[in-house]
C-alpha cells in the first residue's frame, strides 16, 4: 500500500485485525491501526481486505476505525548505540519508554530505537575517489571499550566516494559520505524477515567455548552452528541459556526473552551489569544486546522479537564479529503462531499448530552460519543460534521439539529427573548429541590437547556402560557385581558429580576453561586406569574408595582458573602416590 492510503477496520479478533479498502497493500507491510496508531503488520491479503497482526494491545478498537499504510516493511534500525540496549519485540527502547510513560507501556507509544542526538567519534578509513561496494567498511566508531562498530556501505549501494568527512563527532543521521550522489549516514535500516547477504558460507571449524564442561567437552557447538535446548518446567533452561550468554567466547551476545517471565529478564539484566567478561576484563553488558518480550506483552510481537535478534546478529556478523544469539523460548513463539493461525481459521496441523510451523522455525535457525562477508577488507564472521524449547510435560515428541530437531545440529536435552536430583546443568548425556564433533576435533587437538577426542569417547563409553548396569544393580545390588564393574560405577559417579555438575552461582565453577576441563577428565581417567591395575593385583574396591585422592578429585572444580596447571600436576602425583602405596601394602600383606 502506498503511503497515504487509508483503510478501515472490518473485524477485530484479539491481536488479529482485518481491514477493508486496502487494495494495493503488500504482505509484511507495516500499518498503523486505530486512532492510537498501533503498530501492525500485514500477514495476508484477500481482495481489498488485509489481514493484520497487531503488536500492541487491541482493546478498544472498533469497526470503522482507520488503518494507515506506511509503504515499508517492518525494519530494524542498525547503527552505533545497539550494544547494551534493551528493546521490546518491535525495537522500542524500554528505558526510554519508562522515562516517557512509566513502568507500564501504554498503547501507541513510539520511540526511536537509536538515539539521534548522541554524537559518536567517527574515524574514516577510505579516501575520496575510491571505489566502494556493498558492505565495504568506510570507517568506525568506538561504541564501547570492547566493540569497534564498523560503518559499512548498505548492501544495495556501490560507486565512487565523492565526499568523505574527516575524523570527528557526528550523530547517526549526519551525512558522513556521498557515493554517486547518495548521502551515507551511520544509520541503516533492514527488513527483519529478510536475511542479510554474504559472499559464501564456510565450513564450521572453531567451537564456541561456553565455559560449561558438558557442552565444551562432550557436545561442542561450532561457531555459526545452531542448537536447541529442550526441557520441561524447572529443568534450568533459563539459567543454562543465561550462563551461555554470559561466558561464551564470542564478540557479541544477543539475549531474546521471548514470552518468558519478566523476573527472569530482570535477573539477567542485573547480573550482566555486575559480571565481568573473563576475556576482556570489561562488564558483560558492553558486548550484549537484550530484547525483552515477556509473557505479559502482546503475543504477536514474539515473532518479531526472534527475527529482530537474528537481524541484529547478522549486522554484527557482517562486521566480522562472532555473534551468539539465544532465544528463550521458541515454544512461546510457536504458541503465538498457533493463536494467530486459529483466529485466521486456518486448517490446524498436529496439536493445533499451523502446518507451516517447520518452515517458519527453519527460516529463523537457517540464518545462522559461519560466513565470508561481502565487501572489503576481507573478513569472516559467524552467527550462532541457540533456542530453548519448552515442551509441555517434558514430552519431546510434541511438534515444536520435533520440528526443531529436524533443523538443528546440536541437542542439549534437559532431564527432569536430573533436575530433581539437583544435578545442574541437567543436560542428559545419553540423549544429547552434537554433529559438530568432527568439525572441531582438529581445533581441540591443535589448541587444547591432542587426547581430547579419545578422552571424550572413553568417558561417554563409561557413562553408557553405567546406564546398562543400572538395571542389574536394581536386581542384584551393587555388591554382587565384579570388582571391575564396581570401579566403573564409581568412576561414572565421579564423571557425573565431579565433572558434569557445575555450579552456576559458584565464583570459580561458574566458568571452566577448556584446558582445565581436559585436565579434570585426565585426573578421573588416571584414577580409573590405576584402579583397574590395582584390582588385577587383588585389591578390593573398598580399599580404593578409601583413598584420599578421591576427595581431592571431588574438589578439583574449585581450583582457580588461573595457573591451574601446577595444581593438576600435584593432583596427578597424589593419585599415583596413593595407588603405589596401596599396591605396596597389598604386596606386603601377600608376602606375609
Curated annotation (Swiss-Prot):
One of its GO terms (biological process) is proton motive force-driven plasma membrane ATP synthesis. Keywords: ATP synthesis, ATP-binding, Cell membrane, Hydrogen ion transport, Ion transport, Membrane, Nucleotide-binding, Translocase, Transport. One of its GO terms (molecular function) is proton-transporting ATP synthase activity, rotational mechanism. Component of the A-type ATP synthase that produces ATP from ADP in the presence of a proton gradient across the membrane. The A chain is the catalytic subunit. InterPro entries: ATP-synt_VA_C (IPR055190), ATP-synth_a_Xtn (IPR031686), ATP_synth_asu-like_sf (IPR023366), ATPase_a/bsu_AS (IPR020003), ATPase_F1/V1/A1_a/bsu_N (IPR004100), ATPase_F1/V1/A1_a/bsu_N_sf (IPR036121), ATPase_F1/V1/A1_a/bsu_nucl-bd (IPR000194), ATPase_F1/V1_b/a_C (IPR024034). It is found in: Cell membrane. The keyword Lyase does not apply. It is an enzyme of class 7 (translocase). This is A-type ATP synthase subunit A. HAMAP family: ATP_synth_A_arch. SUPFAM superfamilies: C-terminal domain of alpha and beta subunits of F1 ATP synthase, N-terminal domain of alpha and beta subunits of F1 ATP synthase, P-loop containing nucleoside triphosphate hydrolases. NCBIfam families: PRK04192.1. It is a peripheral membrane protein. It comes from the Archaea. It comes from Staphylothermus marinus (strain ATCC 43588 / DSM 3639 / JCM 9404 / F1). Belongs to the ATPase alpha/beta chains family. Its EC number is 7.1.2.2. Pfam families: ATP-synt_ab, ATP-synt_ab_N, ATP-synt_ab_Xtn, ATP-synt_VA_C. ATP binds at residues 231-238. Has multiple subunits with at least A(3), B(3), C, D, E, F, H, I and proteolipid K(x). It catalyses: ATP + H2O + 4 H(+)(in) = ADP + phosphate + 5 H(+)(out).
Amino acid at each position: 500500500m502506498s503511503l497515504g492510503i487509508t483503510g478501515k477496520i472490518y473485524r477485530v479478533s484479539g491481536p488479529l485485525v482485518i481491514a477493508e479498502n486496502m487494495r494495493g497493500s503488500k504482505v509484511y507491510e507495516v500499518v498503523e491501526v486505530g486512532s492510537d496508531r498501533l503498530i501492525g503488520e500485514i500477514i495476508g491479503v484477500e481482495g481489498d481486505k488485509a489481514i493484520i497482526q497487531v503488536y500492541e494491545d487491541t482493546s478498544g478498537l472498533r469497526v470503522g476505525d482507520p488503518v494507515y499504510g506506511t509503504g515499508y516493511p517492518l525494519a530494524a534500525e542498525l547503527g552505533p548505540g545497539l550494544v547494551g540496549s534493551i528493546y521490546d519485540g518491535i525495537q522500542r527502547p524500554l528505558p526510554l519508554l519508562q522515562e516517557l510513560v512509566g513502568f507500564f507501556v501504554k498503547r501507541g507509544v513510539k520511540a526511536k530505537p537509536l538515539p539521534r542526538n548522541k554524537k559518536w567519534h567517527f574515524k574514516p578509513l577510505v579516501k575520496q575517489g575510491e571505489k566502494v561496494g556493498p558492505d565495504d567498511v568506510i570507517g568506525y566508531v568506538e561504541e564501547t571499550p570492547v566493540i569497534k562498530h564498523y560503518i559499512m556501505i548498505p548492501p544495495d549501494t556501490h560507486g565512487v566516494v565523492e565526499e568523505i568527512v574527516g575524523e570527528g563527532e557526528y550523530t547517526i543521521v549526519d551525512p558522513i559520505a556521498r557515493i554517486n550522489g547518495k548521502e551515507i549516514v551511520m544509520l541503516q535500516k533492514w527488513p527483519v524477515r529478510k536475511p542479510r547477504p554474504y559472499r559464501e558460507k564456510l565450513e564450521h571449524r572453531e567451537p564456541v567455548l561456553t565455559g560449561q564442561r558438558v557442552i565444551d567437552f562432550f557436545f561442542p557447538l561450532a561457531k555459526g552452528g545452531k542448537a536447541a535446548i529442550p526441557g520441561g518446567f524447572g529443568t534450568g533452561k533459563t539459567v543454562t541459556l543465561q550462563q551461555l550468554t554470559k561466558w561464551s567466547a564470542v564478540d557479541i551476545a544477543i539475549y531474546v526473552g521471548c514470552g518468558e517471565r519478566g523476573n527472569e529478564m530482570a535477573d539477567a539484566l542485573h547480573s550482566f551489569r555486575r559480571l565481568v567478561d573473563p576475556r576482556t576484563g570489561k562488564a558483560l553488558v558492553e558486548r550484549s544486546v537484550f530484547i525483552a518480550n515477556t509473557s505479559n506483552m502482546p503475543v504477536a510481537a514474539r515473532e518479531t522479537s526472534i527475527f529482530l535478534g537474528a537481524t541484529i546478529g547478522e549486522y554484527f556478523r557482517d562486521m566480522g564479529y562472532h555473534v551468539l544469539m539465544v532465544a528463550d523460548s521458541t515454544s512461546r513463539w510457536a504458541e503465538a503462531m498457533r493463536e494467530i493461525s486459529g483466529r485466521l481459521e486456518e486448517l490446524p496441523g498436529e496439536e493445533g499448530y499451523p502446518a507451516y510451523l517447520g518452515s517458519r522455525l527453519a527460516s529463523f535457525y537457517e540464518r545462522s552460519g559461519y560466513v565470508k562477508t561481502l565487501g572489503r577488507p576481507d573478513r569472516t564472521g559467524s552467527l550462532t543460534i541457540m533456542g530453548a524449547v519448552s515442551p509441555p510435560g517434558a514430552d519431546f515428541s510434541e511438534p515444536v521439539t520435533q520440528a526443531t530437531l529436524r533443523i538443528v545440529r546440536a541437542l542439549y536435552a534437559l532431564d527432569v529427573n536430573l533436575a530433581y536430583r539437583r544435578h545442574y546443568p541437567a543436560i542428559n548425556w545419553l540423549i544429547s548429541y552434537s554433529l559438530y564433533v568432527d568439525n572441531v576435533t582438529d581445533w581441540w587437538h591443535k589448541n587444547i590437547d591432542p587426547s581430547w577426542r579419545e578422552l571424550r569417547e572413553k568417558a561417554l563409553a563409561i557413562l553408557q556402560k553405567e546406564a546398562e548396569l543400572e538395571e542389574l544393580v536394581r536386581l542384584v545390588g551393587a555388591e554382587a557385581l565384579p570388582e571391575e564393574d564396581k570401579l566403573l560405577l564409581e568412576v561414572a559417579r565421579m564423571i557425573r558429580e565431579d565433572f558434569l555438575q557445575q555450579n552456576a552461582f559458584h565464583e570459580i565453577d561458574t566458568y571452566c576453561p577448556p584446558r582445565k576441563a581436559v585436565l579434570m577428565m585426565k585426573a578421573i581417567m588416571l584414577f580409573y586406569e590405576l584402579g583397574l591395575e590395582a584390582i588385577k593385583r587383588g585389591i578390593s574396591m573398598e580399599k580404593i574408595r578409601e583413598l584420599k585422592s578421591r576427595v581431592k578429585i571431588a574438589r578439583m572444580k574449585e581450583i582457580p582458573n588461573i595457573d591451574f596447571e601446577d595444581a593438576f600436576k600435584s593432583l596427578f602425583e597424589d593419585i599415583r602416590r596413593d595407588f603405589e602405596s596401596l599396591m605396596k601394602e597389598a604386596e606386603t600383606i601377600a608376602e606375609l
